[in-house]
Every structure is written in C-alpha cells, then in structure tokens.
Regions:
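Non-catalytic accessory/interaction domains
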Residues: 1-226, 232-234, 238-241, 246-351
Length: 351
C-alpha cells in the first residue's frame, strides 16, 4: 500500500440472472466507479488478464468463483480467473483444502494443455501444507489423473509433481514400485534418477539399494559423473552430508554450478529440514565468494537452492540473524536472498 496508482485497462465481467456483460475499465485513479446496466449477481475482475495487481472479488463472488471458474468457456478468461484465484490463495483468502479441491476439480475437466500445466504448478503449495489425511487424498487423486487424464503432457507433469511432493507411505510405495519396475512409460532416464534421489531422502532405509541400482542403470559417462556428485547429497549418513557441504564452501568444488545447486537443494530438502538449518548461515556467509568465483546467475541459484524449501521459524531466524550481522550487505545480493526466502518469510509472518 504505497499510494501508487497504475494507469491500466482491463475487462470486468458482470454475471446476471439472464445475461453476462463485459465492461472495459480504464483505471486512471485510485477509485473507479462503474455503472451496472442490469442486476448483477457476480462481478469478475480482470477476465482478460491484462490488469496488474491483486484483484480481490467481493465476499459473495469469491466463493462462487472458486467453485465455478472451470466452467468459463473462454480459454483466456479461464486462465486469468485461475491466476486471480491463485493470488487470492497467496493472500490467504481461502484455505489449502478449498484451493486444492478447486484445482483438482478444474484439472479433471481441463482440455487446454497450457491451463492444465498452470493448475499442476499450483498444486505444489497445498501439497506441502495440507493436513496429513487431506494431503493423502490429494496425492491419490493426482495418481488417478496421472493415469487417466486425456492430455499426455498433463499425465507426466502430474507424475513429476508427485515425485517431488508426495510424502504418504502409500504414495511412496507406488513411486518405489514405478522406479523398481521402470513402469512409468512417460518417464525418461533423468526422471528415474530424480525419483531415486527423492526416494533415497524419503525412504532412507532403502537408500543404498536405490542409489546402487540407479547408478548401474546409467551408461553415459557424463551422467555417471553427475550422479556421483549429486547422490552424496541424498545419503542418510549425516557425516557424509556435512563433508559434502563443507566441500561446497571451496570454489574448486563448485565448478559445475548446476550440479552444485542441485546438491545444495537436496542438502536442504524438506525431508531433512530441521537438520539442514545449520547449513543456512555458513552458506549465506559464502555468498560473496560464490559471486566472486562463479557465473553471473550462480548467486541466485545458490540462495534458491539453500532457502526456497525452508519454512521453519528456526530457518527464518537464521536468515534474520545473518542480516543483523551484516547491516551493510550489498543490496543486490540481499535482494536475491530475500527473493529466495520469500516463502520462508510468508510462512513466518504471523509467528
């Protein structure tokens, strides 16, 4: 709320008992008054997607829109309303359960691959934060859609989302079976390698079997070198994890930056969130050296790998303590840290 007005044009759709109408809004001031040409039940803002900002529907429209957005025939309007709802979800105007239910209902009917892809991208947030029973139901619904959805690209995206986000025993057993039998026909070698990494984190008792078998499946020498570098980050052996982290503090061990970022992200995976808090401060202290010795984009990738998966108050305090200890930290790097830590800060705003 900085008192800034963005002059802009966008459509507002008026939904009445007998008909709908689209009005063009020309927003030039902080307040814009529109005439209603007939009795209106629902007012849908920014249905052409051109508007910039958080559009908050009225308290009557928002729950109706959450239940009915997927019935919008026009693809552009449907995508725009989906994005509007996502922004209202981020603003905490409805619950994880309401949002996930709306997304899954929409996904089951969606015929546009781009909109389906947007929906699947949005599923990740509630998958992380839903209560256990509801999360398990959601995972099972996603598995069903990964086998039955009419859009092939949607089926593989769902499976990849489950690989990254599923945590229930039932889901992990399904994924383990897919990995063991290599039965996910849409999955490629990289997908199976990622699945082995994730299962090693989620099922530490199977880690040795997973990593040994997956390594035997790889034939390409470059992929074997990559595997040998990254797989050290998914072992349950904490001494190995700490040794790997210490090695990443040295520039010569960060030469292949995509591998480094992937390893750092697995070191800070949600499956070991409480353990990895101790990595936050030293990795932030190393950021200036990362900038000095690496590619121009590497500092951003480094802090994303380090912070983007953390949500705990302890992790939040580590970042705050770093800033308190470095009041004159370079602004560009500080902003990169804050951008990567945005989900962490959101999760701890009220705490």
């Amino acid at each position: 709320h900085r008192g800034i007005t963005w002059p802009q044009r966008f459509h507002v759709t008026l939904c009445g008992e007998q008909r709908d109408s689209i009005l063009e809004v020309n927003l030039t001031d902080s307040l814009c008054t529109l005439p209603l040409p007939f009795p209106v039940r629902y007012i849908l803002p920014n249905t052409d997607g051109r508007g910039y900002g958080l559009f908050i529907p009225d308290s009557h429209t928002l729950p109706w829109l959450l239940a009915h957005w997927q019935e919008t025939a026009d693809d552009t309007a449907r995508e725009a309303l989906l994005m509007l709802l996502y922004e209202n979800y981020q603003a905490k105007h409805f619950t994880d359960e309401e949002w996930s239910s709306s997304l899954l209902t929409g996904l089951s009917k969606e015929k546009n691959p781009l909109i389906a892809s947007t929906i699947i991208g949005y599923l990740g947030n509630p998958l992380r934060t839903l209560a256990f029973e509801k999360k398990q139901e959601m995972e099972e619904a996603m598995f069903r859609l990964s086998e039955t959805h009419a859009i092939p690209s949607c089926r593989i995206q769902l499976l990849r989302s489950l690989i990254q986000n599923a945590t229930s025993d039932r889901s992990l057993q399904k994924l383990y079976s897919i990995w063991t039998n290599q039965s996910g026909k849409q999955l490629n070698e990289r997908d199976y390698t990622t699945l082995a990494y994730i299962l090693s984190l989620r099922m530490p008792e199977q880690s040795k079997t997973l990593l040994t078998t997956q390594r035997q499946r790889l034939k390409n020498p470059d992929r074997l070198r990559e595997f040998d570098f990254i797989s050290r980050a998914v072992t349950p052996d904490t001494l190995e994890l700490d040794a790997l982290f210490r090695s990443l503090m040295l520039a010569e061990n960060r030469r292949i930056e995509p591998w480094t970022a992937t390893a750092l992200s697995y070191l800070n995976h949600p499956a070991r969130e409480s353990y990895s808090i101790k990595y936050i401060r030293p990795a932030l202290e190393a950021l200036l050296d990362v900038q000095r010795t690496g590619d121009i984009f590497f500092p951003k990738n480094w802090v994303n790998a380090l912070l983007s998966q953390h949500r705990s108050p302890e992790a939040y305090r580590e970042v705050e303590a770093f800033f308190a200890a470095h009041p004159d930290y370079p602004v560009l790097l500080k902003n990169k840290i804050l951008q990567a830590a945005y989900p962490l800060y959101r999760a701890n705003k009220q705490k």
